[in-house]
Swiss-Prot record:
Belongs to the cytochrome P450 family. This is Cytochrome P450 2D20. It is an enzyme of class 1 (oxidoreductase). One of its GO terms (molecular function) is oxidoreductase activity, acting on paired donors, with incorporation or reduction of molecular oxygen, reduced flavin or flavoprotein as one donor, and incorporation of one atom of oxygen. Keywords: Endoplasmic reticulum, Heme, Iron, Membrane, Metal-binding, Microsome, Monooxygenase, Oxidoreductase. InterPro entries: Cyt_P450, Cyt_P450_CS, Cyt_P450_E_grp-I, Cyt_P450_E_grp-I_CYP2D-like, Cyt_P450_sf, Cytochrome_P450_fam2. Its EC number is 1.14.14.-.
Length: 500
């Protein structure tokens, strides 16, 4: 009897294994084409999940690129993925084939965070009417509230003043600047979204930023990739909450802020910020079920803008200060240009940027070297496309490897070194390079780029105008190697800020 049970069990196991193998082969058959990009041999059911180092994705993709070329394929369980590398191939995909590659693949883990068919937000929204409606609204509303204008510039410089005051309170002692940078940049985006500025000591504010900081990597590691590739696992009770505790807590905090803000909204008054403008659109959209203006999508749109508008800029500024203490000669030259153009009294203005080519070059090189978003948000083909002679089928996930562009050895003189001269010509004039695309390119390029450029210039020049930064005495020289997550952050470091 025991033997019969054992035989039956083994028969079931063998049948299940053969069935899964058959399903796996049938799923892959459409990709067995002569012109499909090459790649590492996938394992049945798992694909290449075990061959990709999700703790250091850029280096893992670099090794595959060296072996298979600028366009290669991966299999994430049953999900086909094509990785695009190098300036020529990335521009072909994002710009030349932009209409056919602007879609987004489903991200099942985000369903747990509130992303639904009627609440797709902006960043991860499928390419179509909802995305167009929300992108148009976000761009126009941010413009209405001062992005690219003098009014917002004054907001940013005032916040930079608060940041400088906080740095002054450190009294030249060693400290890690990332927390204060997060607070200052967050206040800019909070002013746009909620028309509210937080005090740096506000307990709710500090908890919100701490939660967001601790969430880095939750949506980009091995566990996240497995859950996206095999979404049925998300049905396991309690698993999503355990896999993404900080992201869940952050989204809950944003929701609480929205509820409180909504109680103070007066539709008869002009909108105070983007949230008020969105609520007004929700009222207009009643009776139009196809509209993307609803309370659930407001939560997701705010999260998109909050994270994209804060995390990337504050992380870039953290890279900037790290590179200034590692390269004091560059810091001195920036300060000399600030003194010559702006002086020590007047606040920096965006109009100064055109007369400060070296400072502008340094900021661009910080973005290139820091490379905080090396793996772009995935795209998806909406029809068959040809890239670099390869045929990529409809429904394939595309990963534009922006790191391969920002570190392209055929473009940059010193791709692995911090070298501001990458953005200067022989006469010392600023030159923007075609391969500079930290904000991506094409239809899905970052909508917050104008705001980010303003913040980077004004915060950076205000800080270098007021302080000289150095490695604390007795501490080892910090590493310039990043810690991979989304975004890539500097290895934790401390600095001393001494008033000039």
């Amino acid at each position: 009897m025991v033997l019969l049970i054992g035989d039956g069990l083994w028969s079931g196991v063998i049948f299940t294994a053969l069935f899964l193998l058959l399903v796996d082969l049938m799923h892959r058959r459409k990709f067995w084409r002569a012109r499909y990009p090459p790649g590492p041999m996938p394992l049945p059911g798992l694909g290449n999940l075990l061959q990709v180092d999700f703790e250091n994705m850029p280096y893992s993709l670099y090794k595959f690129q060296q072996r298979y070329g600028d366009v290669f394929s991966l299999q994430m369980a049953w999900k086909p993925v094509v990785v695009i590398n190098g300036l020529k191939a990335v521009r072909e995909v994002l710009v030349n084939c932009g209409e056919d590659t602007a879609d987004r693949p489903p991200v099942p883990i985000f369903n747990h965070l509130g992303y639904r068919p009627k609440s797709q937000g902006v960043v991860f929204a499928r390419y179509g009417p909802q995305w167009r409606e929300q992108r148009r609204f976000s761009v126009s509303t941010m413009r209405d509230f001062g992005v690219g204008k003098k009014s917002l510039e004054q907001w940013v410089t005032e916040e930079a003043g608060h940041l400088c005051d906080a740095f002054t309170q450190e009294a030249g002692h060693p400290f890690n600047p990332i927390t204060l940078l997060n607070k200052s940049v967050c206040n800019v985006i909070s002013s746009l979204i909620y028309a509210h500025r937080f005090d740096y000591e506000d307990p709710f504010f500090n908890k919100l930023l701490k939660t967001l900081q601790e969430s880095f990597g939750e949506d980009s590691g091995f566990i996240a990739e497995v859950l996206n590739a095999v979404p049925v696992l998300l049905r396991i009770p309690g698993l999503p909450g355990k896999a993404f505790p900080k992201l869940t807590a952050f989204m809950d905090s944003l929701y609480k802020m929205l509820i409180e803000h909504k109680t103070t909204w007066d539709p008869a008054q002009p909108p105070r910020g983007l949230t008020d403008a969105f609520l007004a659109e929700v009222e207009k959209a009643k009776g139009r079920p196809e509209s993307s203006f609803n309370d659930e999508n407001l939560h997701v749109v705010v999260a998109d803008l909050f994270i994209a508008g804060m995390v990337t800029t504050s992380t870039t500024l953290s890279w900037a200060l790290l590179l200034m203490i590692l390269h004091p000669d560059v810091q001195s030259r920036v300060q000399q240009e600030i003194d010559d153009v702006i002086g020590q009294v007047r606040r920096p203005e965006m109009a100064d940027q055109a007369r400060m080519p070296y400072t502008n070059a340094v900021i661009h090189e910080v973005q290139r070297f820091g490379d905080i978003a090396p793996v772009n948000v995935p795209h998806m083909t909406s029809r068959d496309v040809e890239v670099q002679g390869f045929l990529i089928p409809k429904g394939t996930t595309l990963i534009p490897n922006l790191s391969s562009v920002l570190k392209d050895e055929t473009v940059w003189e010193k791709p692995l070194h911090f070298h501001p001269e990458h953005f200067l010509d022989a006469q010392g004039r600023f030159v923007k390079q075609e391969a500079f695309m930290p904000f991506s390119a094409g239809r899905r390029a970052c909508l917050g780029e104008p705001l980010a450029r303003m913040e980077l210039f004004l915060f950076f020049t205000c800080l270098l105008q007021r302080f000289s930064f150095s490695v604390p005495a007795g501490q080892p020289r910090p590493s310039d190697q990043g810690v991979f997550a989304l975004p890539v952050t500097p290895t934790p470091y401390e600095l001393c800020a001494v008033v000039r």
